[in-house]
Amino acid sequence: MIKKKLLFLGMIVPMFLLPANAAAQHPHDGHYRPDTTALSRTQHLGEVVVRGKYVDRVNRSAYNAVAIDTRKLRNTNLDLAHALDRVAGIKIREEGSVGSAVQLNLNGFTGQHVKVFIDSMPMDNSNTSFGLNNIPAGFASQLQVYKGVVPVTFGGDAIGGVINIVTDHSPRTYVDASYSYGSFNTHRSNIALGWTGKRGFLVRFNAYQNYSDNDYKVKTQWTDLTNSTISNEEGWFRRFHDRYHNEAVMLQTGLINKSWANKLLFGLRYTHEYAQVQNANLMKIVFGGKLRKNWGLSPSLLYEKRNLFTRGLNLSLSARYDYTVTNNIDTLSRTYSWTGQWIPKASQGEGATSLAEFTGKTLTAVANLTYRIGDKHFFTLNETYINFHRHTTDNSANRAMTSAATFMRRINIKNITGLSYQFIPNNEWNAIAFVKYYDTHVTGPVNVSETTRAQYEEQQRNSQALGYGAAGTWTPGHDLQVKLSYEHAMRLPTERELFGDGDYEEGDAVLKPEKSNNVNLNFNYEHTFADAHTLVAELGLNYRNIQDYIIRTINAKGVAVSTNHGHVLGQGVDAAVH
């Protein structure tokens, strides 16, 4: 399979090395990026101005994309998740308050079907402290939202869309800071500093923190400690063990606008998180002493060079190494009720006894090459490599855990190659065709027992697959645009789905990738009246046919597990008027 892939690349790469005289000159080709800036129209969402910053050709591309200019949100307490919640077609669902899990819904696609990137680099396996609902909106200069088919520049396995966080590398000097206080003793603050010298030396510093007691009221069933039964009715109770705080510090420095590099930036990010765990995946199962702690360190590198060797050939290289340490602590010999009262428990641990320490190591590397031939032909080649390792490092603390799977290796390696061709014959229509090659290697514990008693052994599984698709757009009039796209894509299982979280999320290392056929049809109408008022109407139809759909279920003990469900058929309609 490796030989086949090398042959595949060997046929593709020469296409990008055509002689310079094969490409017509264009005054803007040194700054042209056909895949990553396809951002359409202007929208006003509250105080957020959504603007398309694009080359005219890209504006007429088949990608359905919008952008939020988050510079309007500097010095506010808004986070990236709630900034996205203002975009038509996006819904944000939080499991609780500050520090809780966040799920994105983008035109009917949810969870892992929608991927998040920072500067076109996947955020897979980043520390949970560095999540959309923790990062201040001012951290980004722009949020790009791609719905449906996405450019191969985003080399992940998204089948529902992509959210790309674009950070600020502009040559300017600034200081931004904010602090806010809210309900439930919530404190949020952030600071951003930037300086660029006359010779292109750049320094960027960002830091933020979030804190909350999260002692709001919830309606749930509760445990009667006199007979250890759970009530049939529900009552209102105040959360008493849900304190959360996290901190992050980011430093980036390097050079911009040099003859040998448009960008060469080195970065370092430190994150820390402390979270009390109030309940299991089922709210009726409550805890009073369980908690989770983690910290992470992430060095990174970004290199960009436009007009490499020949005019119109642009190269981008980025890499990041994520090192995270997580502690799941559950040692109290107690059984709690939602009233805050408790009774002694014969065994240690409110759930499963744990002092476990897990170490995760992830290497992410992305190479992107674009080439323009004349004014009508555009090629993009992308290679994305993600190597994840996780192991338990504290053996003595886990003596109470009897599972042999505890100390087995957990490895997930993903290699995705994408190639696209865009044809722009005129201003009325254009089309894009693309192909993706997926190569995955998974190593982890597998339950091989045929009885109720678990028996684990370490197994390895390799899989390869091919994805492909096409998209086109037609502009029959000045105000109307029609977009049609089809994609046969893969959604690879995440590390959490494969290996769990070592606590109340159980993994399944033999999960198969989802295989999906998606069709999207969009109508966009925009008309400006008297150069002062703009009416925008959008109608979107989507169809998806998914095989081996990965579904998350929760058992009676509050433990979640992901399994391949089978066949899922989905159809949707979304409409918006601005």
Language-model segments: residues:
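Outer-membrane beta-barrel translocator domains and adjoining extracellular loop/strand segments
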Residues: 192, 216-224, 276-285, 327-336, ...
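Outer membrane beta-barrel strand-and-loop segments of large Gram-negative receptors
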Residues: 414-418, 511-512, 518, 526-578
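N-terminal periplasmic accessory domains that precede
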Residues: 47, 80-83, 100-105, 130-133, ...
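Short acidic/polar hinge/loop motifs at secondary-structure boundaries
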Residues: 113, 121-147
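Short, acidic, small-residue-rich periplasmic hinge/interaction motif at the N-terminus
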Residues: 26-72, 81, 540
